[in-house]
Each structure stands twice: as C-alpha cells, then as structure tokens.
C-alpha cells in the first residue's frame, strides 16, 4: 500500500485512518483506544501497556500539507492532562522544520508518510507466513537444473 492509496481509502472518513493506525499498534502488542471523533482532547489514540498509559498518538491524514508546530504543541498539551510520557504524531505527509525542531525539544516521536508505510509493511508482513523478502532470495540457473531430468537436459543442450 502506498501513501496515495491510504489517502484515497480514508479521505472520505479520516476517523477510519485513526483505526488503521491503532491497528498497527495493536499488532505490536499495545491496547489501542481510539478517542471519539469530536472533543478528543488533543489526541486520537491512547496506547496502553499493562493497563497503564504508554503513549498518546495524534493522526493526520494530509495529502501535501505539512504538519506544523501548532499541531505538535496541541499533542504536548494533551500529555499534561493525560499524564503521558510518550507522544507519537503520525501523518501521511511530512513535518515542517519548525514542527521537527519542536518535536525534538519535547521528545515527540514523528512518523511521516514514508515511515508509516515502512512500519505498516513490517507489521502486516510479519503476519503473513507466506511472505518473504524478494531481495534475500536469489536463484540462478543451477538451482533449476538439478530438477530437470538428465535426458531432457541433454536434448536442450544439444539444440543450443
């Protein structure tokens, strides 16, 4: 799946994108609680580990608009109310320089569109027992020749 696919899939109902992100965290072992669509308190997902708040997550389904500092500040403000030590901001686009600087200063983990796709692939491919990394498997002609009967090989090589 690509960023374009995600935007196309969720643009009519961005709250479903929040559930998509929550499911990624569920796959890696968190309890992920999605907040109501309105009055969400400045975050979209509360991550719990052993019934304790682990992190707050804000999700933005943006096409080309970069996430700016004010949205990161809103998430940081929510952490005070919820007493969350870890903050994660996910977007399908990217972050402005000011947002990156502020996130670094306040220890907010940023996940842009490119990294979201990588994370999704890693999480969902780990479930697929038939999945393999194509780059890690290379076959050459010798790998096939051992399975072709000798008499057929003789005919093939005589005709070359």
Q: Over which residues does each language-model region extend?
A:
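Mixed-charge (Asp/Glu-Lys/Arg
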Residues: 1-41, 46-160
């Amino acid at each position: 799946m690509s960023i374009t696919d995600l935007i196309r899939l969720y643009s009519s109902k961005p709250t479903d994108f929040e559930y998509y992100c929550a499911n990624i965290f569920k796959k890696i072992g968190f309890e992920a609680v999605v907040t109501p669509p309105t009055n969400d308190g400045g975050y979209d997902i509360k991550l719990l580990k052993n019934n304790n708040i682990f992190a707050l997550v804000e999700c933005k389904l943006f096409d080309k608009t970069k996430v700016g500092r004010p949205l990161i500040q809103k998430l940081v403000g929510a952490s005070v109310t919820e007493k969350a030590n870890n903050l994660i901001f996910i977007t399908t686009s990217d972050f402005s320089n000011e947002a990156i600087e502020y996130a670094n200063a306040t220890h907010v983990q940023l996940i842009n569109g490119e990294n979201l796709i990588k994370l999704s692939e890693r999480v969902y491919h780990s479930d697929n027992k038939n999945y393999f990394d194509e780059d890690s498997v290379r076959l050459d002609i010798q790998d096939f020749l051992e399975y072709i009967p000798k008499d057929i090989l003789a005919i093939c090589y005589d005709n070359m």
